[in-house]
């Protein structure tokens, strides 16, 4: 298993609407394993494939971070949602920044697991928020897109400087 490079905003690939996975095979399972490795290495609780420059509809989640409650959602689709909530969200692709994002309190999602079997999941709390955040990534939406243009621009400028500093070192 290999940790992958996480793209940093404003990378254009983070704004792409991802293609569905047509077949869950060993190559997809390898991507899933690498995504989990990357997510844990970066201390995240969720990761969407476009964040590691794989433009397919794949999500890995472990809100507990204990590797005991891992979720793989391939081609996820929210079927139902209810309630209103929101927390300050962070993102591995937007390091050092957090913002309050409006989300649904509960979601029902349908997806394929790592073996290609369809399942339905009822989620609430942090898991529901994480699912919504990661599905946004699959649709080319980042949490900064919920912010005012001025706040979004300030974050963009700071991260461009950050990326230049990283490139020099």
Swiss-Prot record:
Fe cation binds at residues 91, 133, 137. GO terms for biological process: co-translational protein modification; translation. GO terms for molecular function: metal ion binding; peptide deformylase activity. Its EC number is 3.5.1.88. The active site is at residue 134. It catalyses: N-terminal N-formyl-L-methionyl-[peptide] + H2O = N-terminal L-methionyl-[peptide] + formate. It is an enzyme of class 3 (hydrolase). Its cofactor is Fe(2+). Keywords: Hydrolase, Iron, Metal-binding, Protein biosynthesis. The keyword Magnesium does not apply. Binds 1 Fe(2+) ion. Belongs to the polypeptide deformylase family. Removes the formyl group from the N-terminal Met of newly synthesized proteins. Requires at least a dipeptide for an efficient rate of reaction. N-terminal L-methionine is a prerequisite for activity but the enzyme has broad specificity at other positions. This is Peptide deformylase.
């Amino acid at each position: 298993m290999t940790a992958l490079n996480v793209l940093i905003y404003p990378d254009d690939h983070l704004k792409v609407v991802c293609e569905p996975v047509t077949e869950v095979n060993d190559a997809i399972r390898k991507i899933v394993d690498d995504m989990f490795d990357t997510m844990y290495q970066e201390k995240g609780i969720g990761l969407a494939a476009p964040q590691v420059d794989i433009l397919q509809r794949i999500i890995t989640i472990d809100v507990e971070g204990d590797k005991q409650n891992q979720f793989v959602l391939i081609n996820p689709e929210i079927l139902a949602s209810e309630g209103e909530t929101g927390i300050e969200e962070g993102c591995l692709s937007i390091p050092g920044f957090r913002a309050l994002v409006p989300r649904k309190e509960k979601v029902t999602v349908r997806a394929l697991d790592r073996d290609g079997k369809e399942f339905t999941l009822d989620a609430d709390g942090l898991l529901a928020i994480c699912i919504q955040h990661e599905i946004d990534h699959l649709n080319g939406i980042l949490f900064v897109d919920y912010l005012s243009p001025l706040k979004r621009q300030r974050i963009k400028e700071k991260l461009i400087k950050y990326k230049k500093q990283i490139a020099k070192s």
